[in-house]
């Protein structure tokens, strides 16, 4: 046999088979050994990689987010098929026709943040593969900004009537431009003010937010809101309605230390007496007033004290229904006995307002004598949420704090607590 001639025939045959396979769009995977002699019988067993045409199989979807709040970003995602795909996201701003690549946006998804993009920006992705390039459809990013007309928005959205709008303030907003506030709330609007707070334990040092001076709570766990008087005067002088609230605080039932080192033996009734004293001494509340008088029922911070050489930490909890009733009944008794009205309220979150125990609403007894100022923020984007708040045993809310992200131009501050009120919110509960 002529071995040289046989080797040539074998080489020609191998090359012919390889050419045939290649013409079908298949290429053999890398050989385990570049020097191994070709084996005809092994060709059919070699793994093959097919080049797939680049194609978008799922388009990115448009999204709506808020400039502020809990939903301030959106993730655009694309699905594609093909071989060795590469991604490049692009944007197009409103009013332009140019697509511009986004630096480092080279994955299947792109996260767009409200702080980085203007409302109406469009996004697409260009996908490149071994067999072509595909462009996705454009997805639009809608960015919602806080509203300046929450009362009108709520009436249109929920079919309500007589709704007014307001802002609630405390010493944390000391120095705020009140003309800007009173202009924003409108002629029939309102301002809710913190009268005082029991949030700090006794003998606790803190910095006065109005004067920036170091001070202490002393022997009682309460502090008068240092901005209350000035803000109340400005609101009254502008002809806007007022509301007044007391932040629940340290009282004897929540202090587990033997010497009452946190609460100092203070009671809800004593808190109510102090609230009324500061309310009447301010001068803006008269016998003709029907202002909401609110007990703010919320938990507070954890505080640490050294007692007899040992460290003790307690967290300020929200008051219970019996504690709230003790405060509210004392306020009512003291005011009505002096010829004043008592338009009693409680403030709390919607989940707390609707909490239940053994099949009964926790706040049923409180709801019998008060109206409800409820906090329900949705995504907290400075706009009226898409759903009305839960109210538990109250038939409805009287005042609704819908956000802490209201933006009022000219105030010199950022986000503010904003509210809307029903038409009868300044009418005492019968």
Question: Where do the protein language model's features map onto the residues?
Answer:
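Structural beta-sheet core signal
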Residues: 193, 244, 295, 344-346, ...
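Substrate-binding cleft of extracellular glycoside hydrolase catalytic domains
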Residues: 150-338
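Post-signal peptide N-terminal regions of Sec-secreted extracellular proteins
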Residues: 37-79, 142-152, 156-161, 183-184, ...
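Aromatic-lined carbohydrate-recognition surfaces of secreted/lumenal glycan-active proteins
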Residues: 247, 335-356
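Distinct, well-ordered alpha-helical segments
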Residues: 354-365
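N-terminal secretory signal peptides that target proteins for export/translocation
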Residues: 1-6
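Functionally critical loop-and-helix segments that line ligand-binding/catalytic clefts
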Residues: 148-179, 184, 363-430
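Ser/Thr/Pro/Gly-rich low-complexity disordered regions
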Residues: 9-28, 36-146
């Amino acid at each position: 046999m002529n071995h040289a001639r046989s080797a040539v025939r074998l080489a020609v045959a191998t090359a012919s088979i390889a050419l045939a396979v290649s013409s079908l769009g298949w290429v053999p995977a890398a050989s385990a050994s570049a020097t191994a002699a070709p084996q005809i019988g092994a060709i059919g067993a070699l793994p093959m990689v097919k080049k797939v045409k680049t194609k978008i199989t799922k388009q990115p979807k448009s999204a709506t987010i808020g400039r502020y709040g809990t939903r301030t970003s959106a993730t655009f995602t694309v699905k594609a098929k093909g071989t060795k795909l590469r991604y490049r996201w692009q944007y197009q701003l409103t009013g332009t026709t140019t697509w511009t690549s986004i630096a480092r946006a080279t994955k299947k998804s792109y996260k767009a943040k409200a702080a980085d993009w203007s409302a109406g920006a469009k996004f697409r992705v260009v996908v490149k593969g071994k067999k072509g390039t595909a462009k996705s459809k454009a997805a639009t990013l809608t960015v919602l900004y806080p509203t300046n007309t929450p009362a009108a928005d709520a009436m249109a959205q929920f079919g309500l009537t007589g709704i007014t709008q307001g802002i609630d303030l405390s010493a944390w907003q000391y120095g705020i431009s009140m003309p800007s506030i009173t202009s924003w709330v409108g002629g029939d609007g309102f301002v809710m003010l913190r009268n005082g707070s029991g949030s700090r334990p006794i003998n606790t040092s803190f910095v006065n937010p109005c004067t920036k001076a170091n001070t202490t709570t002393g022997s009682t766990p309460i502090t008068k809101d240092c901005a209350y008087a000035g803000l109340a005067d400005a609101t009254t002088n502008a002809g806007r309605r007022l509301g007044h609230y007391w932040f629940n605080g340290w009282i004897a039932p929540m202090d587990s230390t033997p010497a009452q080192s946190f609460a100092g033996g203070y009671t809800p009734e004593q808190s109510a007496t102090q609230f009324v004293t500061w309310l009447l001494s301010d001068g803006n509340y008269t016998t003709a007033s029907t202002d909401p008088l609110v007990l703010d029922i919320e938990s507070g911070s954890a505080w640490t004290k050294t007692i007899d050489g040992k460290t003790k930490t307690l967290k300020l909890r929200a008051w219970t229904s019996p504690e709230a009733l003790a405060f509210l009944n004392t306020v009512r008794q003291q005011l009505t006995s002096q010829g004043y009205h008592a338009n009693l309220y409680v403030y709390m979150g919607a989940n707390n307002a609707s909490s239940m125990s053994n099949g009964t609403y926790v706040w049923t007894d409180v709801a019998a004598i008060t109206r409800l100022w409820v906090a329900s923020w949705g995504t907290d984007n400075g706009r009226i949420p898409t759903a009305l708040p839960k109210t538990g045993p109250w038939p409805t809310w009287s005042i609704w704090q819908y956000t802490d992200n209201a933006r009022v131009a000219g105030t010199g501050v950022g986000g503010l607590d904003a509210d809307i009120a029903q038409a009868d919110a300044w009418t005492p509960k019968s």
